[in-house]
Amino acid sequence: MANAYKQAGVDIEAGYEAVSRMKKHVQTTMRKEVLGGLGGFGGMFDLSKFALEEPVLVSGTDGVGTKLMLAFMADKHDTIGIDAVAMCVNDIVVQGAEPLFFLDYIACGKAEPSKIENIVKGISEGCRQAGCALIGGETAEMPGMYSTEEYDLAGFTVGIVDKKKIVTGEKIEAGHVLIGLASSGIHSNGYSLVRKVLLEDGELSLDRIYGRLELPLGEELLKPTKIYVKPILELLKKYEVYGMAHITGGGFIENIPRMLPEEIGAEIELGSWEIQPIFSLLQEVGKLEEKEMFNIFNMGIGMVVAVKEEDAKDVVRLLEEQGETARIIGRTVQGAGVTFNGGTAL
């Protein structure tokens, strides 16, 4: 049967076109250590030039979750790849690792070349922001598994750090200062609740501006996750950082303790940073309790670093010079868990 595979729903020619269109974006991410080009069976990266005493590779993998459904609804696909990169590289930089390379996995119902190109364009932008090379990936056309408009997106990154410079959090003591780096918005966690609260129950429109939002709701919800790699690596060159937490699913309450020793807790000062209007809208429309908000969302802080009190102001200044909005948001205390001072934040 001629064109049997195409009749089964897999268009090989469209796949070839998608690869051809993405190459110019991938090329912008290349580093001198990358060996070979796009299209090989495996991506190669030369580690021989890294002058580290005890080099340690650090890996991370993640996806974008149901934020993808907002991209489908808005038919906007050129930034969701930034989210995929951010979720991976932010996870490994908290251990002090410099991201080296990234690989993506796209599974779709129909490999529409322009859509795949836009997804990879976003992935490439994320890689440039993180300073890592996009050295490979897989686009799997899977009719029957996904509708023609649907796709899933995941990624994998590898970074490197000298063993003696790994940031573990084990030396954090009571009295260390916690500095928060502002998020761009919701980032990539909690979107199942976001959709239920705002779109299903609240029946809000993606095209309208609500409350104190500055953008239509759809644009606000699709703001890409902030990538903190470059400012954090710059910080690590100049100051001792005792611990870091990427504030993802589980919010403050689950993620900050991940960097703390068992006997140390965190005391957060509400009102010490600006919480974006999207979180107020979510709480108001969904009638959500403040504690629940802090247990699900980043609440305006995407990364937390722990430093000595005498370094705190200088660290804030350095991060601000790197283009970040940084605030002292609390300190570590004897005890366990996360407590909040200062009343209502929203």
UniProtKB/Swiss-Prot annotation:
Q: Which Gene3D superfamilies does this UniProt record tie to the protein?
A: PurM-like C-terminal domain, PurM-like, N-terminal domain
Subcellular location, principal: cytoplasm
Keyword flag ATP-binding:
yes
Query: Which top EC class applies here?
Result: ligase
Q: Does the keyword Nucleotide-binding apply?
A: yes
Q: Which family does it belong to?
A: Belongs to the AIR synthase family.
From the Swiss-Prot or TrEMBL record, give the protein name: Phosphoribosylformylglycinamidine cyclo-ligase
The species is Bacillus cereus (strain Q1)
Give the classification, highest ranks.
Answer: Bacteria, Bacillati, Bacillota, Bacilli, Bacillales
